[in-house]
């Protein structure tokens, strides 16, 4: 036994070849691409040959291929046979048969040597054969794993070794995970701007690759000999979840030993060079697109043919083949040399149409040759600035980067002599940063040569303090995104550089934003920097907010997020706190896999923070994040909106919107837009007069010089700026300054003679302008190339190409003709006739490919999606602004026009370069597979099991199974395709055309119900515009006309018979009375339900008698009235049934809870109940109150989301209701007893509120009078029933008509009428058909019925009687809060509207949850929708939404505009609708202004902070002032000498020194520049007209809006200062900084924070006001 063990240990398992023999193997390699199921088309190829291996030196062997043959496959798998590719075999035979040498030791293939004549493609095929010999045998283990080298790289391999002693063989099984590689061979193109979603890949992978090998080894004296080797490799791809199916590329190899002979082998005479290892070497497939194959020996000729085809066939409108032809042109240019491109350019540079196509195709070619040509043309000034910008920037983003290309770009971009155009240089610098990003994408540390030009440019700009170039350098460094650039960026970050704090805030923000792309490589370093910036409270709030945004984008750890939350607990800036808190809270709702860890961390952090931050209004900075991720699709999208505000103004200082996409286990930022509006609000509020032209205010400046620690707010140079990013790279940015605005205003006002551009355009339009525009674009080229085991590259790629064309012909006739002194403003008052013939069209071609791609052969699967749209527009527009007329006239549709065409089809393709005419392209879903299920026969279970057994034999066919016998066997299972066809047309008979839709779809979803299988197949749909011919006269032209003003009535063609409307009013009882009935507010109608139910029959009979009496006038109206009567009866019956049902439901609910009510406390029993009982027994309640009662009774089931919070808020409602409710309403008492939530309260309109207060105790006696009062209201007057067109002309008329050949007209007309009475404004809109016999109409009527109620009714159909919807808006109270109720109610709506309602109802709960609404299942009226908005505080409202099946509510919703509310508002009546609408502009305007009040020793700052301060006597304090470098006003306050309770005010505005002094008589004195102005002479206006002084109440009011002072009021005791919106964040003094930062209100002039308001002022500098009056000025800020 010992001897046997020792012998077994000496056995060598490593494969080897004897040096004296030549081994001949039979080799076969097959690769196929398609879906895994049988019965569908596949494409692939087979390579089989003889292989001889012999030793030529120590451990060096010679491999020679004999009798190679290549066969192609394209057909139904596995039925179709392989067919020989004879021409391709013949072309490659000379290379395939050339011997190669390789090193082979212990089963490992070393270096490979081959002749230079052998191409990389052929050598890779030989590597595939050698890969079969790669074995790593361990004698000490039978099962083991390791990282093994191979053709695909160094990947994880698992071995299992079995020894069969009886058969004297060793079986080795090897499997490789091609997704787990230390060094994976792959090539990614077009993915540099996306990054991997690691969490997505943990869940599912879109691509997987695996390989399995089986070896049979025969022991020999020197080791083992490989007698047979088989391999199977599978790559799968799906854009969706892999569990739902994927397309596969399957490769198989088989190497079988046939003979071993003792033959002397001669070494080849030609020199064999080292061509690398066994790893795959990329070759020509990098430049070879997988969708086209052609010979490139003479590309110039082919390029000219393609160019000619594109130019000639895409002038009028784009052709469907234009995108594919453009891709072909791009591929041909990739094969060109520099001389070829030069020759083509010289031939076509003078021809504008050809020139444009060439300049668009060269950047898409993206080769070094094309880029070099573009740079030479720019340096030689052969391109215009517009052409250079477009061509160079696109080329820099698409070109394949290497060291030479980067160096070439740097020499061009950073040499000012080359790029003299500022716009071109700006975009080129940004593009250079993006180029560096792609060049250094695979390495952590980028080469210094690439970054040096950017670093030098940044250092130079910062050293020269050049603001614009510094911003450009920072943005370029941000595009590059390299960690080595951090040191340059830190020079602009405060806290890291001594001079950075002096830079403008915009530069500091841009420096922080430049760290975002760097964080993708060095997240830890960026987190450290941004955290340090965030913690520095001395920095500007905007810088800190952007730092927190960048920090959270790096997805910090739980510990770092907790540190951030801890810092927020001590945060003094409300802007920073609001922004960061809202950002973290928004992330907690994220469902994207990439944010799982961050979402959990933020969820914990938010719980640590105060809920008060949730209640900050929208004046404070906010961050919003919304995303969705669908796991079945493994795709998602996200949107981020960051709103940054500096001074709590309505207009934010910055807005950033970013959109993200999750697809194919990667994340990309396709679009980001940023807008910075700092300084824009100030310009909008100011006049055009320049502040710089003001005379110096000497006294103010003299005081400012003496202020210790003065720190003026920096003035803005840039009013607004914007940028756009695509895929994380900033493409462009622009800035708006005062100079730009002045130039724009000047361009409008100056005569055309001085405006050369406008004059040229006007003259060209008068002569007639014609243009043929075309713009091709390679939208996407995304590729991944992987090697396969047989040595051919497998490619998965996506191409999107688009071509847009526009044929434009425009001619204008202007009356009167423009003269030399004609300006743009006068041009708008001319009569302009514009003849336009424009045909825009666009074609797009998307191709997804999976398969083999080389320069000699291509096989695989292609999915083609084509889209084409054409919108021909030929019309004549007439514009006459003086007459207020606009008219468009066009010809009718004469022939069928395909407006939109979409098609998608999957193919199995195979083509080789030697026989392009024999290329095959078969649908993946064959036609014979589409069979009707009715033709299928039922098979029993036995037959089915036999069929599966037979089919199982072919589940994994090996190379031997691919014989001719199998291909022709009848065992193949037939498939049937899912087939669907749709078609529909919508006719516009009045205009003689129809829009038709046709769709057809066939897919393979019958195999597997998944998104991928639904795409695979054939799909086609189109939308066409067709002429619709009728038996009547033909249509000659179509006209659209809009007329406003006094001539609107003249455009009305058909005058509607007014008696039909009058009759309808009489039968239905007055349109507004019906409206009032539909829109009765809950609790408003005091008639009991029972009494209303008993009166229904009499009401119906009276209505019938009324209709019958009116019907006796004519027989035609009789039939009409009978129809209307039936409809009315049906409506009433429906309403009665619903009212009875709601009443009974409410009654049952009350009975169930009667027992519970009797157990309430004693003081609850003492509440007035007589009125409740009488109301329930005699008065009853209407349907609305019943519904409310039912809602109230069911309101005790608190919402699951936040029971405690909701309950506490409901107590607030209870307390408010207890304090304000004085009526004896039983519903009120019940509500108080139940502690109801918001949805349980009944909304009480203003009239209902007054009615119960005035008539309590006499409910029964007042019901009839209330009813009569209601009937006598304004809604029931005869005057309201009239048609407004009888007494006033329409305010506008719109006519859409078709003029027929017989002179008649048909179409539609719309007219609007108004009644401008102040008390009850009213609007009516009437739309009718022009044809006299048509009764179709749309009637809309809206009226402000009272100060508290507005109503609108819309009816449409035959004489406006088929459908109707009513809407009302009523003010009132919800509990004790002023409220507004908007209610919509309908009786009949179209079926399409009902379907839309049902669809929306499915998404409402989810959307409401995302918006923070709570939900309660409640059966509300089925034909009613209600929204109630209750004002609970000046900054918040409660929202209640009642839909038919659900109730939604949200409390404390922040609103951007502060609503002025006094404490006594709870006891007063609600504001009326008229006052609300009138006050809305005032509220918005007031919300932009700030007010400060000082009375005795009490102060209220601009931001609402209250404090007390005892001023020392005789010392002036700065109450409020303009805190910028150029001070425009200052208001000072001191204690009057005559009394401690009186104050004296001094205001310095512009060049005026205004003193307002108290007197002992209780009045005030006014002095201007030390000259007393009697109050009797007020009002006063200075010479400039900017300062106004007037008497107000008991004091004086000063207004100087031009200088930022809205008003200054003083009456001797109280001072009130109100500043304009432009002064947000620009004031200082005792009134504060007016920036919304309540926690930082007591900042001192040098920026330090005081401990509180009670700190006594330090002795300030004293200044003599005059030589005789010594008045000290104590500087307090």
From Swiss-Prot:
Q: Positions of the region Disordered?
A: 1089-1232, 1252-1280, 1636-1659
Matching InterPro entries:
Lipid_transp_b-sht_shell, Lipovitellin_superhlx_dom, Vitellinogen_b-sht_N, Vitellinogen_b-sht_shell, Vitellinogen_b-sht_shell_sf, Vitellinogen_open_b-sht, Vitellinogen_open_b-sht_sub1, Vitellogenin/Apolipophorin
Q: Where is the composition biased (Basic residues)?
A: 1197-1212
- Signal peptide range: 1-8
Keywords for this protein: Disulfide bond, Glycoprotein, Phosphoprotein, Signal, Storage protein
Instruction: Cite a single GO MF annotation.
Output: lipid transporter activity
Q: What induces it?
A: By steroids (estrogen).
Q: What is this protein called?
A: Vitellogenin
Q: In which tissues is it expressed?
A: Found in liver, testis and undifferentiated gonads of estrogen-treated fish. Not detected in the brain and spleen.
Disulfide pairs here are: 1492-1631, 1515-1674
Q: What residues does the Vitellogenin domain cover? A: 17-655
What PROSITE patterns would the database entry show?
VITELLOGENIN, VWFD
Chain intervals with Low complexity compositional bias: 1098-1122, 1169-1196, 1215-1229, 1260-1273
| SMART domains (UniProt xref) | DUF1943 (SM01169), DUF1944 (SM01170), LPD_N (SM00638), VWD (SM00216)
Function (record text): Precursor of the major egg-yolk proteins that are sources of nutrients during early development of oviparous organisms.
Entry's Gene Ontology BP terms: cellular response to estrogen stimulus; response to estradiol
**PTM description:** Phosvitin, an egg yolk storage protein, is one of the most highly phosphorylated (10%) proteins in nature.
Q: Where is the composition biased (Basic and acidic residues)?
A: 1123-1145, 1636-1649
